[in-house]
C-alpha cells in the first residue's frame, strides 16, 4: 500500500465528513494511495494526475503549544474588524497540524484552538466570527475543540457565518456559536459518522500476492485491507460509530441549547439542510447575506462602523499569514507527499 500515513487516516477510522467527499476521495486519491484501481459501487475509478505537496510539520499538543509560540511572536493569528476576530475554518479539518489557517486544503484543530484562545485573551477582541466552509474532517480532536469554543462564548460572543458549507465536523464547530447564519444557498448538517474499509484481496489474488498477518491478540488485525471485512468486525465498527454519533449529537445539542435537542439532531439521520430548511430544522438561526449578517454582529456589539464590511469576507484580508506561525522545526522525512488533502477529510 502506498502513502501509508494517509491511508491510516482515511481508512478504518471514523471521520465526521459529508459522504460525497468520501466518493471524491476514492475517485481522486484512492488509486494513488492503494497503488491500484479502486472499485466503488461496481464502478471502476481510475487514477488521476494529482500534484504533489508537502504538509507542515506536526506539533505537540502538550509541549510548546502553538498558542504559546504565537504569543512569543506577538502576531495576532486572525483578522480584526471593529473589535471582531475573524477566524476562517475551511477545507479538510484535521488533528495535529501546527499552522494557522488553511494549508494544502486543510485546517487543523490545533490551529483553530490557538486562534480562539488568543482571541479570548486579547482585550481588543470583543467578539469572534467563525467563517466556515468545510465538508468535515477527522473525529480525533473535534469534540474537545467544540467544548473549548462553547466555553469561550461564555465570555465573548461568537457567531458562525456559513460560507456555503458547514457539514459534519464543520457543523460540530459551527453549532457551538451563539448564532449560526448562512446564505440562501448555504447548507449545514450531516450529523453522522462514516468509516471506509478497503478490501484489496481480490486485486492481490490477481497479482499473485498473498499477505500473511502474524499477530498476537484476537482483534489485532481487525479491518485489515488484505481480506474481506468479516461481519463480526463490521458489527464492531458499526457499534463504535453509533456511539460517536450519539456523542456528536450530544455536542451539537449542548451548543444549540434549546434550539436543537440531541434527539432532534439524531432524527436528522445525517441529512443536510439548505437555507431556510436549516433554520426550520433548528440547525441554523438566520438566512442572510453574510456581509449584512456581519453588520448585524457589529451592531449587536455596539462597534462603530470604521471599516468597509466587505473586508470581513474578503480572502485577501481574512487569511492570516501562515508563514509566520509555521512550526519552527520541520521534519521532511516525516511529511506525507503526493496529496491534496482537501480529500483526506472524506473518509
Go through each PLM region and give its residues.
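N-terminal organellar transit peptides
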Residues: 1-347
Amino acid at each position: 500500500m502506498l502513502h501509508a500515513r494517509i491511508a491510516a487516516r482515511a481508512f478504518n477510522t471514523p471521520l465526521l465528513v459529508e459522504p460525497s467527499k468520501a466518493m471524491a476521495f476514492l475517485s481522486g486519491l484512492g488509486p494513488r494511495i492503494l497503488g491500484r484501481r479502486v472499485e466503488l459501487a461496481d464502478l471502476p475509478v481510475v487514477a488521476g494526475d494529482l500534484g504533489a505537496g508537502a504538509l507542515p510539520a506536526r506539533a505537540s499538543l502538550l509541549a510548546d503549544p502553538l498558542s504559546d509560540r504565537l504569543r512569543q511572536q506577538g502576531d495576532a493569528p486572525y483578522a480584526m474588524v471593529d473589535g471582531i476576530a475573524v477566524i476562517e475554518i475551511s477545507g479538510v479539518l484535521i488533528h495535529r497540524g501546527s499552522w494557522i489557517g488553511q494549508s494544502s486544503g486543510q485546517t487543523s484543530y490545533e490551529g483553530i484552538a490557538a486562534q480562539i484562545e488568543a482571541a479570548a485573551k486579547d482585550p481588543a477582541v470583543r467578539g469572534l466570527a467563525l467563517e466556515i466552509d468545510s465538508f468535515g474532517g477527522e473525529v480525533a480532536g473535534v469534540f474537545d475543540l467544540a467544548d473549548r469554543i462553547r466555553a469561550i462564548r461564555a465570555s465573548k460572543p461568537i457567531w458562525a457565518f456559513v460560507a456555503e458549507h458547514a457539514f459534519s465536523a464543520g457543523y460540530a464547530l459551527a453549532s457551538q456559536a451563539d448564532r449560526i447564519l448562512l446564505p440562501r444557498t448555504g447548507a449545514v448538517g450531516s450529523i453522522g459518522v462514516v468509516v471506509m474499509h478497503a478490501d484489496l484481496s481480490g486485486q492481490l489474488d490477481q497479482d499473485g500476492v498473498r499477505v500473511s498477518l502474524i499477530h498476537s491478540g484476537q482483534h489485532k488485525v481487525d479491518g485489515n485491507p488484505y481480506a474481506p471485512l468479516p461481519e463480526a468486525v463490521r458489527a464492531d465498527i458499526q457499534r463504535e460509530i453509533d456511539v460517536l454519533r450519539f456523542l456528536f449529537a450530544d455536542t451539537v445539542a449542548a451548543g444549540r441549547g434549546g434550539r436543537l435537542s440531541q434527539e432532534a439532531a439524531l432524527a436528522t439521520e445525517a441529512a443536510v439542510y439548505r437555507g431556510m430548511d436549516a433554520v426550520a430544522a433548528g440547525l441554523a438561526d438566520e438566512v442572510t447575506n453574510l456581509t449584512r449578517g456581519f453588520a448585524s454582529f457589529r451592531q449587536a456589539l455596539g462597534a462603530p462602523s470604521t471599516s468597509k464590511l466587505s473586508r470581513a469576507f474578503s480572502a485577501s484580508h481574512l487569511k492570516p499569514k501562515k508563514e509566520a506561525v509555521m512550526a519552527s522545526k520541520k521534519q521532511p522525512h516525516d511529511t506525507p507527499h503526493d496529496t491534496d488533502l482537501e480529500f483526506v477529510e472524506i473518509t
